[in-house]
């Protein structure tokens, strides 16, 4: 989970100016859920 703040920080700095919050927020949720799924798959497999 140490990488998550860095990833979200980079995403904010790169896309905050291009995407409005209404679009950015769902994308952040998708990124978090995707990251959790990847971590779950890698830990199980």
UniProtKB/Swiss-Prot annotation:
Highest taxon listed in the record's lineage: Bacteria
Protein name: Uncharacterized protein TP_0137
Species annotation: Treponema pallidum (strain Nichols)
């Amino acid at each position: 989970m140490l990488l998550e703040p860095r990833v979200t920080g980079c995403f904010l700095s790169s896309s905050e100016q291009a995407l409005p919050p209404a679009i950015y927020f769902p994308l952040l949720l998708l990124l978090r859920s995707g990251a959790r799924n990847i971590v779950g798959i890698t830990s199980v497999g």
